[in-house]
Curated annotation (Swiss-Prot):
HAMAP family: MutS2 (MF_00092). The lineage of its organism: Bacteria, Bacillati, Bacillota, Bacilli, Bacillales. It is an enzyme of class 3 (hydrolase). This is Endonuclease MutS2. InterPro entries: DNA_mismatch_repair_MutS_C, DNA_mismatch_repair_MutS_core, DNA_mismatch_repair_MutS_sf, MSSS, MutS, MutS2, P-loop_NTPase, Smr_dom. Homodimer. Binds to stalled ribosomes, contacting rRNA. It comes from Staphylococcus haemolyticus (strain JCSC1435). The keyword DNA-binding applies. GO terms for biological process: mismatch repair; negative regulation of DNA recombination; rescue of stalled ribosome. GO terms for molecular function: ATP binding; ATP hydrolysis activity; ATP-dependent DNA damage sensor activity; endonuclease activity; mismatched DNA binding; ribosomal large subunit binding; rRNA binding. Endonuclease that is involved in the suppression of homologous recombination and thus may have a key role in the control of bacterial genetic diversity. Its EC number is 3.1.-.-, 3.6.4.-.
Length: 783
């Protein structure tokens, strides 16, 4: 894509914002190379890649990437025989640590949330990460942040131990000298210091002859000599030899560790590449959150729909968002309206958002944006007059337009700002229309701004062209920056003049001079503006309702998944309990069989072997392995009748058969829900004997329903009605009843459940299953 376009649309500023969100040079390097892709698959992949990280970033706290650094130069040096120092080895160690932490984080996501498989790109990156635990362990055990540990090798530990003990002896020797009363007046200061890596004491020059040893230095005034006493010369020499030995051993260990790094060179480079990309994508995610970015959907057919788009470089708290759309077969949009009304900002918003999207950045629009992939974006925006070339504004623009017309094609987007401006209005308007015709013949998508009234009629004479305008508030005498698609701009001169106090006589006379047609056009445009405003308001309301519907759908879907998961858990637990019982029974049977055989052998009891084996097999056949699917006994058509109590296997709920529709289907009542279900999904259950009732007759039960409707009740009424109903239900020997309170604000549901929680006749309660009415129902189990 043209660099000139990226510069005019200020894409470099977007990149600088993203770069500020990176942690490492690896991420910043990738941001610096970020540019719009033009291949459909690449654009879609980059967007999905960013969206995956953004989803995780918005839900979870990502592991820290601090300390991540570029190590490829170090790997190269290790491969050609160089030796890495401790600081460089720590950079390798930190890379491994960062990748391990991120992989652990991702694995925890997999365990906690099965939905994480919807991140296939990130999953692939995590699978690419190599196992470098051994290398990490070696570096970690031998290096701290500044130096090798004493324990890095047996030899190093021994050398440093000798250095320490020798230094201690030297210190003790010098302490005796400097603390001696006889030497107090001979020393410049009672301290031990170091010169030329040797331990020395500061002696006054006039007492030089009193101290045998080597003079290593003197003060600037010459009054103090730094002398190494002869008593410690040999010990200092020993320290020097040990320091050399330490350096040799240190080099050997670093060489060994560097060799290990070289052996894992490929893995380290893969880790660097993946974690650098993670840093880059995380920076994109952070920036997306700051602009409330959303993911667009890309189409191979030419499409542009940007709901409530705004320019990301403007203050999002004050900028006016506009829906930019090329509807149906529209290929050219012409924006008219007042200067400083936001026409140029609209052009830049469209161009910049497309560049951002094709660079894998989430875009500043509402959800639901749709875009196609453009091979290039061309723009002629702003005053690019060249002083060096002595070009006028018109000439400068025309030179740029000529270049655009030579390069653009049907897969390009072209943005013209004030097309044809800077010359005679009639000639400029004619040129503008001719240029637009030419670009339309090429097939490019075009958005242009103009103040020429001739271009308002342009769209009515050509197919695929739409007018648009920026709104002007005549009451405040200022633009609203609101884009009106499909509505041409109109002159506000008369309204503004009247608002400013110009006499109506002058205004009315002026109106007669412009002709009836022009006045009718302005009236028509004013009507279109009002209709457009009303449509926008309706669209906003529809968007709100759609969001609410989607949220409700997602909530219900999530609850259904929870229900299915809970149902599976209960089934597994039931199977496990059943298996344990069968195992116990089998074990008991084995014991009995053993006793019977023993009895037969001892007393000759008349028990046949094959009969014992048959009994044992009957018990074994009852066992159901946990891994097998639920083995349910299917009821034949002639075994289920209307009025039978059954268990609906797919829902795990009890119900009553109301009607047999055919040999395959029956109508079943489950609580307040009637459903037509396959007979193979039904399991006949035994009716429980009713408890005798002293208070009411059997006839009374039939008059009490299993559900109580409380929708529309106030709190006091609902509680009173609920108490009476529960008393009647208990007397009727009901085990379970349904309280229907509806969803609403949830206040009535809360009141009902709080009261049930305290009621002495209520054993437990729960929210309704989806098959029972969901949130709008509470199911109470009675004592």
């Amino acid at each position: 894509m043209r660099q000139k376009t990226l510069d005019v649309l200020e894409f470099d500023k977007i990149k600088s914002f993203v770069a500020s969100e990176t942690i490492s040079d690896l991420g910043r390097e990738k941001v610096s190379k970020m540019s719009p892709a033009t291949d459909f698959e690449t654009v879609e992949f980059q967007m999905n890649e960013t969206d995956e990280i953004s989803q995780i970033y918005n839900k979870h706290r990502l592991p820290s990437l601090s300390g991540l650094a570029k190590i490829s130069p170090l790997i190269h040096r290790a491969n050609i025989g160089g030796v890495l120092n401790v600081t460089e080895l720590n950079l390798v160690k930190r890379l491994i640590q960062v990748q391990n932490q991120f992989k652990t984080f991702y694995n925890q996501l997999l365990e906690e949330d099965e939905q994480v498989v919807k991140y296939p790109i990130l999953n692939d990156k995590m699978n690419q990460l190599p196992i470098l635990s051994d290398l990490f362990q070696e570096i970690n055990e031998k290096c701290d942040t500044h130096d090798l540990y004493d324990s890095a090798s047996y030899e190093l530990q021994g050398i440093r131990s000798k250095i320490s003990s020798t230094n201690q002896r030297i210190r003790q020797n010098l302490d005796r000298i400097v603390k001696s009363q006889a030497n107090q007046k001979k020393l410049s200061d009672a301290i031990i210091t170091v010169r030329n890596d040797r331990n020395v004491i500061p002696v006054k020059a006039e007492y030089r002859q009193d101290f045998k040893g080597i003079v290593h230095d003197q003060s600037a005034s010459g009054q103090t000599l730094y002398i190494e006493p002869s008593s410690i010369v040999e010990m200092n020499n020993q320290i020097s030899r040990l320091r050399n030995d330490e350096a040799v051993e240190r080099e050997r260990i670093l060489t060994e560790l560097t060799g290990m790094v070289a052996a894992e060179a490929d893995g380290c480079l893969i880790a660097e590449s993946v974690m650098g990309q993670i840093d880059f994508l995380t920076a994109k995610a952070r920036y997306a959150r700051s602009i409330k970015g959303t993911k667009p959907t890309f189409y191979k057919d030419r499409t542009v729909y940007l709901p409530n788009a705004y320019h990301p470089l403007l203050n999002k708290d004050t900028v006016v968002a506009n829906t930019i759309e090329f509807v149906d077969d529209i290929e050219t949009v012409i924006i008219t309206g007042p200067n400083t009304g936001g026409k140029t900002v609209t052009l830049k918003t469209l161009g910049l958002i497309i560049i951002m999207a094709q660079s894998g950045l989430l875009i500043p629009t509402l959800d639901g944006s749709q875009l196609s992939v453009f091979e290039n974006v061309y723009c002629d925006i702003g005053d690019e007059q060249s002083i060096e070339q002595s070009l006028s504004t018109f000439s400068s623009h025309m030179k740029n337009i000529v270049e655009i017309l030579q390069e653009t094609d049907k897969n390009s987007l072209v943005l013209f700002d004030e097309l044809g401006a800077g010359t005679d209005p009639s000639e400029g308007a004619a040129l503008a229309m001719s240029i637009l015709d030419h670009v339309r013949e090429i097939g490019s998508l075009v958005m242009a701004t103009t103040h020429y009234p001739e271009l308002k009629a342009y769209s009515y004479n050509r197919e695929g062209v739409m007018n648009a305008s920026v709104e002007f508030d005549v009451n405040t005498l200022s633009p609203t920056y609101k884009l009106l698609m499909g509505v041409p701009g109109r002159s506000n001169a008369f309204d503004i003049s009247r608002k400013l106090g110009l006499s109506l006589g002058i205004i009315n006379k002026a109106k007669t001079m412009i002709g009836t047609d022009e006045q009718e056009i302005n009236s028509m445009i004013e009507s279109l503006e009002k209709n457009s405003k009303r449509v926008d308001e309706q669209r906003i309301e529809l968007d709100r309702l759609l969001k609410e519907a989607r949220k409700t759908h997602d909530d219900l879907e999530h609850q259904y998944e929870q229900y299915k998961s809970y149902e599976k858990k209960l089934m597994d637990e039931a199977k496990e309990k059943a298996n344990q019982r069968v195992k116990s029974a089998t074990k008991e049977a084995d014991s009995i069989l053993k006793e019977l055989r023993t009895l037969r052998d001892q007393k000759g009891a008349d028990v046949k072997e094959h009969e014992l084996i048959d009994k044992k097999k009957q018990l074994d056949d009852q066992y159901e392995a946990k891994s097998l699917k639920q083995n349910v006994q299917k009821q034949k058509y002639d075994e289920i009748h209307a009025g039978d109590e059954v268990k609906v296997l797919s829902y795990g709920q009890k119900g009553e058969v109301l009607e047999l529709v055919s040999e395959e289907e029956a109508v079943v009542q489950m609580g307040i829900i009637k459903m037509k279900l396959p007979i193979e999904d039904l399991e006949k259950t035994k009716k429980k004997k009713e408890k005798p009732s002293k208070m009411v007759t059997r006839q009374n039960r039939q008059t009490i329903k299993t559900e109580l409707h409380l929708r529309g009740y106030r709190y006091e009424e609902a509680v009173s009605e609920l108490d009476q109903y529960i008393d009647q239900a208990v007397l009727s020997n009901y085990e379970q009843v349904y309280i229907i309170h509806g969803k609403g604000t949830g206040a009535l549901q809360k009141a009902v459940q709080n009261h049930l929680n305290k009621h002495k006749s209520v054993k437990s309660y729960r929210g309704g299953m989806p098959s029972e009415g969901g949130f709008g129902v509470t199911v109470a189990e009675l004592k």
